[in-house]
């Protein structure tokens, strides 16, 4: 089941990124005392009292100029309404209530989704005046916090997890293959959905951000049940051009959470972009099957080496997806489209595959003989044995003498040997290490 999504919204410089960093426990966003400075990662996985959720910092889509702040805040609120299960509406207790605060509060109230009002900067004076002022918003009791000092953060998190839905979204049977179509706007995601379905079930336009909602489309190919999850575009075209791609990253997060296999759609006319790397990273980190789909291949002038050049670029820019197959298609002309669903089915089976413990340990033993494990200060890594702990993604438990001796490069080596012998194409592989002595 997908993890709940929590969005922090509010006007620039109220402390959204500081709160985001305080909650996740380390500083990954750029924080300065100027509006519009968050330029880095905008999501993180959070655990609080055995509740797991995805936290989104909409500070990553703040405007840089005061003139467009009201419009920007409305877009933030709309994003939260469409995507988040719980919205934290952050206001500045020092500055007091603003017209923009009132406008966004009205939108959030109409959404009928849980909204928590966080009054920041309570470590300053005159907070009581602001406290009662914010009751005008009609969102409920302000939760007093100081994101800079860490005051009240635990109370806020307690309230957040209380409002999580019991069932996150539609629950499909385990045998239904859930496929998320992800990628930046205007790469042809909806056209791919339509081509797979063979009918026009999703509105398609050449204008980025015209898909009206995230649309789940169940269908049967005669053998298996599928659900295509088409990530939503903007409900309306953003007034700020740069926001469109950032919004779609956040919407992709929600789709990836629910998926078994992700189709990462790349525009052949543009190549791999920064946003492609962000969305691809989220799919990889969440253990999803991934297929890299290069769309609009019909628009590319080709010679004998064109495809190889594209493959090299993709493997360089998305090196962590070395396991992901690459398909070159045209949703418009249906070039190689039958291969897409065929590959989805194959990757889904690869994610669910189990290998025998005996065969696994033969591969590991042979690998350690061919390439001796690393050592440090005279102590050498020993892999006593391994077993497959789980599937989706395939996860292996290795019993070793010292976790600190397992270098990333050697883990990659073991992973490659496992892939060479058993497959697992299109899916990440995870390792869990358990320490034991040779006498155990």
Swiss-Prot record:
* Entry-linked InterPro entries: G_ENGA, GTP-bd, GTPase_Der, KH_dom-like, KH_dom-like_a/b, P-loop_NTPase, Small_GTP-bd
What SUPFAM superfamilies has UniProt attached to this entry?
P-loop containing nucleoside triphosphate hydrolases (SSF52540)
- List, in alphabetical order, the Gene Ontology terms for molecular function in this entry: GTP binding; ribosome binding
Q: Which residues bind GTP 1?
A: 10-17, 57-61, 120-123
Biological process GO annotation list?
Answer: ribosome biogenesis
- Enumerate the spans annotated as KH-like domain: 353-437
Binding residues annotated for GTP 2, in chain numbering = 183-190, 230-234, 295-298
Sorted alphabetically, which keywords does the UniProt record give? GTP-binding, Nucleotide-binding, Repeat, Ribosome biogenesis
Pfam families (UniProt xref): KH_dom-like, MMR_HSR1
Tell me what this protein is called.
Answer: GTPase Der
Protein's organism: Alkaliphilus metalliredigens (strain QYMF)
Q: What is the lineage of its organism?
A: Bacteria, Bacillati, Bacillota, Clostridia, Peptostreptococcales
């Amino acid at each position: 089941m997908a993890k709940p999504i929590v969005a922090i919204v509010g006007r620039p410089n109220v402390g959204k990124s500081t709160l985001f960093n305080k909650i996740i426990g380390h500083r990954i966003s750029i924080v300065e005392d100027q509006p519009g400075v968050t330029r880095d990662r905008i999501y993180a996985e959070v655990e609080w009292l055995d509740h797991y959720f995805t936290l989104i910092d909409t500070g990553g889509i703040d405007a840089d100029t005061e003139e467009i702040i009201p419009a920007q805040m409305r877009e933030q609120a709309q994003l939260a309404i469409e995507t988040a299960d719980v919205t934290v509406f952050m206001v500045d207790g020092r500055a007091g209530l603003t017209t923009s605060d009132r406008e966004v509060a009205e939108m959030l109230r109409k959404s009928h989704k849980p909204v928590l009002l966080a009054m920041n900067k309570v470590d300053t004076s005159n907070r009581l005046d602001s406290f009662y002022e914010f009751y005008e918003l009609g969102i409920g009791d302000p939760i007093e916090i100081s994101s800079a000092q860490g005051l009240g953060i635990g109370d806020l998190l307690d309230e957040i997890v209380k409002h999580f839905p019991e069932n996150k979204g539609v629950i499909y049977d385990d045998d239904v293959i859930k496929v998320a179509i992800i990628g930046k706007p205007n790469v042809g995601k909806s056209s791919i959905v339509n081509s797979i379905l063979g009918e026009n079930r999703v509105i398609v336009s050449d204008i980025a951000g015209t898909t009206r909602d995230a649309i789940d489309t169940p269908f049967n190919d005669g053998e298996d049940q599928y659900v295509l999850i088409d990530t939503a575009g903007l409900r309306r075209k953003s007034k700020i051009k740069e926001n469109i791609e950032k919004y779609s990253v956040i919407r992709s997060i929600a789709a990836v959470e629910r998926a078994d296999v992700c189709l990462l759609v790349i525009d052949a006319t543009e190549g791999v972009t920064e946003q492609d790397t962000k969305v691809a990273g989220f799919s990889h980190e969440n253990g999803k099957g991934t297929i890299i789909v290069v769309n609009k291949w019909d628009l590319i002038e080709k010679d004998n080496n064109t495809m190889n050049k594209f493959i090299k670029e993709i493997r360089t820019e998305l090196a962590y997806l070395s396991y992901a197959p690459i398909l070159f298609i045209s949703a418009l002309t249906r070039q190689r489209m039958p291969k897409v669903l065929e590959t989805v089915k194959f990757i889904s089976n690869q994610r669910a595959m189990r290998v025998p413990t005996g065969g696994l340990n033969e591969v590991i033993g042979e690998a350690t003989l061919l390439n001796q494990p690393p050592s440090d200060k005279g102590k050498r890594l020993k892999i006593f044995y391994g077993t497959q702990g789980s599937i989706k993604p395939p996860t292996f438990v290795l019993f070793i003498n010292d976790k600190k001796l397992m270098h990333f490069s050697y883990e990659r080596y073991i992973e490659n040997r496992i892939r060479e012998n058993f497959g697992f194409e299109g899916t990440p592989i995870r390792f869990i290490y358990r320490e034991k002595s040779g006498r155990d």
